[in-house]
């Protein structure tokens, strides 16, 4: 279908929606009305881009994802890099020392399936303690190569997903729980299954049967998938499970669990460096090799992983903000409703309610 026709159809639908006034007392219908309008607006923006329109990184993320990531300067990452320099003493560059450290925590390829199965089972068990999932829900896992992403959930409908894990690069032990939660329970698989059950099947909202990737829905999806890791596991619960189950299953030294996650916790604070590389690269301020070098220097990505990430930027552009900004917005939204010290049941309840509702990123801002 020609792009001009898609744009005209989306514009007409926005006009029709503007003529409909949902009952103010019906919060869900009000959310649905705003959600549909904003999804259609993002479709028009995407069509405009495919037709040749040039947007800055921030203009694009606002148009497509209803959000703009904060700007961070090099100096803001330096304190964390200095901390890592102390935590990882020795000769050579910091990235070389970090890579050497991480190499000791890779999951051997012949143990990968077993480790992921254990992580998935635990994530599912924890999710089922707090969420009622549709009968028959399930997913299968495939291991693939030659992708720009590390993991992907292909939702098949009827409460089933295909989850693909990219094995181009070695997979470290922390990725087992991260991917099991993010792609599966309580992340993308649960998100899509609950939308299908609660909104499409129970309420007849046919629009839920279509997932527009380059839309505000993706910030909610990626944000909840990343925050879902913290919902499923407190820091101490995760360390205990890694120590007693996953490290032994991977043949790794369980006595080093705390050491490993102390380093990873510091590295995680550098996540917004990835946004800055993407912003500068996609704005034309730096080239691809400079973006990869930035990722290596400020986001602590190995050269191979940085190169993979720049391929992701080529494919998905400002989508990168959905992971870290999305997580932060979801975290702020839920903690504003149940507090930072709220009990696990309260947090799960707010989290599941968010998964099963048509909220926009702008709805999450308190």
Predicted segments with their positions:
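N-terminal maturation segment of proteins
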Residues: 1-366
């Amino acid at each position: 279908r020609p792009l001009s026709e898609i744009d005209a159809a989306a514009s007409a639908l926005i006009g029709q929606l503007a003529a409909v006034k949902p009952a103010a007392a019906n919060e869900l219908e009000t959310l649905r009305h705003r959600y549909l309008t904003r999804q259609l607006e993002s479709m028009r923006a995407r069509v405009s881009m495919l037709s040749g329109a040039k947007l800055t990184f921030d203009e694009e993320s606002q148009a497509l994802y209803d959000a703009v990531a904060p700007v961070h300067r090099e100096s803001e990452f330096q304190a964390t890099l200095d901390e890592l320099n102390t935590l990882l003493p020795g000769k050579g560059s910091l990235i070389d020392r970090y890579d050497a450290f991480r190499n000791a925590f890779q999951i051997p390829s012949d143990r990968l399936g077993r480790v992921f199965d254990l992580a998935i089972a635990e994530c599912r068990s924890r999710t089922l303690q707090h969420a009622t999932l549709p009968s028959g829900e399930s997913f299968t896992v495939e291991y693939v190569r030659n992708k720009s992403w590390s993991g992907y959930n292909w939702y098949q409908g009827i409460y089933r997903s295909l989850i693909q894990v990219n094995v181009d690069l070695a997979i470290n032990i922390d990725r087992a729980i991260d991917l099991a939660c993010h792609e599966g329970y309580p992340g993308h698989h649960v998100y899509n299954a609950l939308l299908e059950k609660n909104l499409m099947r129970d309420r007849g909202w046919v629009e839920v049967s279509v997932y527009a990737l380059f839309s505000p829905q993706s910030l909610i999806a990626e944000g909840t998938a990343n925050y879902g890791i913290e919902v499923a596991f407190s820091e101490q619960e995760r360390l205990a499970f890694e120590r007693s189950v996953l490290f032994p299953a991977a043949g790794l030294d369980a006595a080093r669990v705390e050491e490993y996650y102390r380093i990873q916790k510091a590295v995680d604070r550098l996540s917004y460096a990835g946004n800055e590389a993407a912003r500068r690269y996609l704005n034309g301020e730096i080239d691809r090799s400079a973006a990869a070098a930035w990722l290596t220097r400020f986001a602590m990505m190995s050269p191979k992983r940085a190169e993979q990430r720049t391929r992701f930027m080529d494919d998905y552009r400002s989508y990168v903000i959905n992971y870290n900004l999305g997580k932060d917005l979801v975290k702020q939204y839920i903690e504003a409703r149940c507090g930072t010290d709220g009990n696990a049941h309260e947090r799960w309840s707010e989290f599941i309610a968010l998964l099963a509702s048509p909220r926009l990123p702008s709805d999450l801002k308190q």
